[in-house]
């Protein structure tokens, strides 16, 4: 019987195991998960903290026992893989509850260990990060047990912004600090102005170019010299791939610790695959490396690996587009394609407009700021970004499909919109981007 070992039981690992079982009823599948829970909805954790999502079962939908019963897949939580012997095809596992070590053999090994939260290194009972359900429970219980009223959020990436909004929704007084002037780095920085506008309109204090110097009990001392008391501190200062244990093997990593994979999610070592936040791949539409630690990529990787193991070798991964979106109070910010700083690899032009999301005479019309970058040599799309209160997601999704299909900026004029006054214009914003580009 073929033995398949999966490292990690969250989005990538659990989904991959489930997809393998769908196509393969016979192999023995075992998942080793170093933490307490499996298959939690990590994208939903901030909303659970904010009581927007009230039911625990909605963010923690399945247990190892149920997974075993329904899918005949063994999940061992609190079991951490600490080493890989790719010559003998074994992994070394430690039971984190008993400290017992043992070896397990595999025919196929799938690495989906995810990423870990970076830490500022301060030793305090008041400081938390948010990466898993255990972190979520700790934050939730701390707020209740200590009747926390005043929170500090450190960092201004999309997770920090979601945490801030949800702490505010829960009734806490929140302050945001960030060590640079660049926030939400997946967006064009000038389009992030709505973030500051939303903070200002709610009188939420924020300071850029600010850092923590020390934490003593409730008292936080900042680089600026300001000292202030907080009941709870949430760090959101980036992540790193959980790949330290992979260094024991011959699996190739890049200089940042990401696992290199091909279009089948194979590593350089036979019978070892990787997916999720731990990998580096390429963009789909341009020849540049890409790390996209988001849910879509993990789920796509799970499907491709399962198909590969089932013998369907023609199903491959064609690369990332990096499509991303975040809600911040009344606004939505989204982008697709390469990062702004990667545009320097190309000769490019930019087209933008700021227009109502649907017919102006129909109630509820709000503006969307839409921006598209294209390569002036072949006129293919490189990047797009949008911000607004409504209609942002569908424009970015359409432009994602356009990039996937290698459409030119001019061909956006041919996009046939689903038009009625409550939804769009006869010439949609995406069409207008194409028309505006004709003279460029």
From Swiss-Prot:
Gene3D superfamilies: FAD/NAD(P)-binding domain
Residues that coordinate or bind substrate: 15, 19, 22, 39, 42, 71, 299, 427
Residues binding FAD: 8-33, 267-277, 419
CC cofactor note: Binds 1 FAD per subunit.
Keywords: FAD, Flavoprotein, NADP, Oxidoreductase, Redox-active center
Cofactor: FAD
Active site: 43 (nucleophile), 43 (redox-active)
Catalytic function, reaction form: NADP(+) + 2 CoA = CoA-disulfide + NADPH + H(+)
Record remark: domains: Contains 2 FAD binding domains and a single NADPH binding domain.
Annotated HAMAP family: CoA_diS_reduct
Homology family: Belongs to the class-III pyridine nucleotide-disulfide oxidoreductase family.
Function, in words: Catalyzes specifically the NADPH-dependent reduction of coenzyme A disulfide.
Name this polypeptide is given: Coenzyme A disulfide reductase
Source taxonomy: Bacteria, Bacillati, Bacillota, Bacilli, Bacillales
């Amino acid at each position: 019987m073929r033995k398949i070992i999966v490292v990690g039981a969250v989005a990538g690992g659990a989904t991959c195991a489930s997809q393998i079982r769908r196509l393969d009823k016979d192999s023995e599948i075992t998942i080793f998960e170093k933490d307490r829970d499996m298959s939690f909805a990590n994208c939903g954790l901030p909303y659970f903290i904010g009581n927007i999502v009230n039911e625990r079962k909605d963010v923690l939908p399945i247990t190892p026992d149920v997974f075993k019963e329904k899918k005949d897949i063994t999940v061992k939580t609190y079991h951490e893989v600490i080493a890989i012997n790719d010559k003998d095809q074994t992994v070394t596992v430690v039971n984190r509850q008993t400290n017992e070590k043992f070896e397990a053999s595999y025919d196929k090994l799938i690495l989906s260990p995810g990423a870990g939260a970076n830490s500022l290194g301060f030793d305090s009972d008041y400081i938390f990060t948010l990466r898993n359900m255990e972190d979520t429970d700790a934050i939730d219980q701390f707020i209740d047990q200590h009747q926390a009223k005043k929170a500090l959020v450190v960092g201004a990436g999309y997770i920090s912004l979601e945490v801030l909004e949800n702490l505010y929704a829960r009734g806490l007084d929140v302050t945001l600090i960030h060590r640079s002037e660049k926030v939400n780095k997946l967006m064009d920085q000038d389009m992030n102005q709505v973030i500051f506008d939303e903070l200002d309109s709610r009188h939420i204090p924020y300071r850029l170019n600010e850092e923590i110097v020390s934490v003593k009990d409730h008292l936080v001392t900042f680089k600026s010299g300001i000292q202030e008391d907080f009941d709870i501190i949430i760090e959101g200062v980036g992540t790193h791939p959980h790949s330290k244990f992979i260094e024991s093997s011959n699996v190739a990593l890049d200089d940042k610790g990401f696992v290199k994979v091909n279009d089948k999610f194979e590593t350089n070592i036979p019978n070892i695959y990787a997916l999720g936040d731990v990998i580096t791949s390429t963009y789909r539409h341009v020849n540049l490396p890409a790390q996209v630690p988001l849910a879509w990529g993990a789920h796509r990787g799970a499907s491709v690996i399962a198909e590969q193991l089932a013998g369907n070798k023609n199903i491959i991964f064609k690369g990332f587009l990096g499509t991303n979106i975040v809600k911040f109070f009344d606004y939505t910010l989204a982008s697709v394609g390469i990062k702004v700083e990667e545009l320097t690899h190309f000769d490019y032009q930019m087209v933008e407009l700021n227009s109502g999301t649907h017919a102006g005479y129909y109630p509820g019309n709000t503006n969307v700021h839409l921006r598209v970058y294209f390569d002036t040599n072949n006129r293919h799309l490189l990047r797009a970004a949008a911000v607004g209160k409504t209609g942002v997601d569908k424009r970015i999704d359409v432009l994602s499909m356009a990039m996937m299909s290698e459409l030119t900026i001019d061909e956006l004029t041919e996009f046939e919109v689903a038009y009625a006054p409550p939804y769009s214009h006869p010439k949609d914003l995406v069409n207008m981007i194409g028309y505006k580009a004709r003279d460029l």
